[in-house]
Every structure is written in structure tokens, then in C-alpha cells.
Amino acid sequence: MEKIGVISDIHGNLDALKVILPKLVELGCKEIIHTGDVADIGPQARECFELLKKYNVLCLTGNHDRDFVKNQNVHKPMSHVSQAHKQYVFSSLDGLQAEFAEFPYYVTRICGGKKIVFEHYCRETDYLTAKYPFKPLDPHPTAEKFDEMYAKYDCDAVFFGHKHEPCDIIGKKLYVDVGSVGCHEFPLATAIVIQFDQTHFDYQRIAVPYDFDSLAHKMTDGTLPDGEYLLKFYFLHTIKD
């Protein structure tokens, strides 16, 4: 059986990333795919990117990565990430724009005879030229909604991120939200392992404990703009919309 590791939305959480990557290698994953969003929210985006490169992870473009490439360091409507925060993170990533610009929006793999698309989220038809390349995030996805959203996709399954919350939905295709590696309230770094041979594929979710206290300290020591707020909103979920 061959194996592919899939992670998503690391968002500068080096503490989570540095435990999940060696675990995926230990489990025999010959390829690891990150489905977008290295940048913003967490305190160590640059260090995360360097570690992803060390492990030869295939990085796909997320909306925050795209913001960095296009230097869109302003607060956006409906976003909880401030201009000050984005400016700080983008400054920490200085010199890496060209590498981030090389991230593809999606890749496909044939696993067990099935075509799988990996991406950050469902793309607009004109995603390469659109003002915003991804369709609006659906907070309450269903098979019917995803079937409509992904109707033009020629594939059997889609693995994606963006919402940070894992889900597994079977409609006309298989829809799998990988969930964020560590952008949640649990002190666990999470990932998916896809196993396949010539005729079949399946997948399992894995979780590895990581040092959440270390992350929390880096986000609240006063260095990261809005770090305490972002910790409460994106990780602890003690602040709601």
C-alpha cells in the first residue's frame, strides 16, 4: 500500500507542525501535501515554511498565502485578522514571495483508480483572474451543497481545508475537509493518511499531542500583534463571531 499524508492550515503553528511531519514520515507517507495557509494567525509562519521545505512538503495556495504574494496586508471584511497582524507576518516572511507564488492552487492524484483533487477550497471558475479565487465558505456544508459547489469538478474525491474543522461528506463525490493541523482548541496536531493500491483507497485521521502551552506563550508574550485575541478566537474558541 502506498501512502500520502495530508495536512492543512498550519497558520504559523510550528509547535504542531514539528510533531506531525515526522509522524507522517514514520507512518510511511512517501508524499505530504499541505492544502494551504502557511501564513497569518500563528507566530512562526517563516519557521513553518522552512520546516515544510525540509520535509519536501507540496504546498498549495491558501487565501492567506495569496494575500502575502499579492501584498494584501489590509484588514478585510468578515476577517478577524488585522492589518497590523498581517503586516507583521508578511514582514517576517520577507524575501519568500517568489517561493509562495509558486504554490499551485490544486493538484490531482490517482489513488486506487480514483481521481482525487487536493486544494484549499472550491475554486471559482476564473480563479486565476478573479478578485478572490475561492467560493464563499459554507459554514454548514451538506452533500447537496457540496454537490452543487463542486459540480464542474471532474474527480471522485476532493480533499481541502480552509474552514479548520474536519468533515467527511459523501455525495456525488467524496468531500473531505482535512481540518487545521493545530488551529483548534485541542493540544493535538492532526493530519490525514491516505492509503491506496491499484484498485482501492481509504484514509484515516491521526492526531499527535503537541506543546500547546508553548504556542500560547508565543502568542501572548506581546510580540505578535493581536496574538491574545487570535489565540482566543481561532484556538480556544472563547470569542465567537
Where are these regions (language model features)?
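Beta-strand-turn-beta hairpins that frame and shape the catalytic cleft
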Residues: M1-G5, T108-V117, G171-L174, Q198-D202
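N-terminal active-site segment of His-dependent metallophosphoesterases
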Residues: M1-Y55, D226-G227
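Active-site neighborhood of phospho(di)ester-bond hydrolases with catalytic His/Asp-centered motifs
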Residues: I7-S8, I32-D37, L58-N63, E119, ...
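Active-site environment of divalent metal-dependent phosphoester hydrolases
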Residues: H11-A16, D40-P43, H64-K70, E124-T125, ...
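Glycine-rich phosphate-binding loop signature in dinucleotide/nucleotide-binding domains
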Residues: L24-G28, C111-G112, K152-D154, Q198
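Active-site neighborhood of divalent metal-dependent phosphoester bond hydrolases
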Residues: Y55-R109, K114, P136-K152
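Anionic-ligand binding region
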Residues: A130-I169, K173-Y175
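Acidic, His/Gly-rich catalytic cores of divalent-metal-dependent hydrolytic chemistry
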Residues: D168-D241
